[in-house]
Amino acid sequence: MALIPKSPTINLCRPNAHAIPLVFQSDTPDPRDVVFLQDTTGSQGPYIQSARKAIRDICDKISGSGRLSKDLIRFGLIAFRDHPPQDKTYVTKEFGFTSDVDVMQKNLASLVASGGGDGPEAQTAALAAALNMDWAENAVKMVILITDSPPHGIGEASDGFTESPDRKSLDGRRFAT
């Protein structure tokens, strides 16, 4: 993660990272809404602490960059696990938007990796929940998905879900991946 000097760009990936670089442009004073979708199933056990740290670092970099005032940036968090009967705790857990990085850090600290039960998880439910969040009307919107598994109902013929329960709410929406 790096701020590019004398540039309106905040790069959210480490150099040489095994990821697609995410670039947060700040050319205009439009508000920014950034939502993190965090897999909290048991398979995330070895990774959840570093995922929480990476999210905190991203929020700190964006908030501390001085390129956007506090009232122009909001962060959201949705934790997701799996659909019953594989997991009975929750499918999604929504924390809503906040401009306060300390609140975001408290929300992140509450995440515990547990449950799941099969390979695919409830990413489509998390995406559907993200679509229904209280987005600022004129905000530039970004969703960052953090997971190690494929979603139920999309491309997994033997996962027991012929179609994701939330896929219909995603149909017709435009996503950049």
Feature-to-residue mapping (PLM):
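Divalent cation-coordinating acidic motifs and surrounding scaffolds
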Residues: 1-177
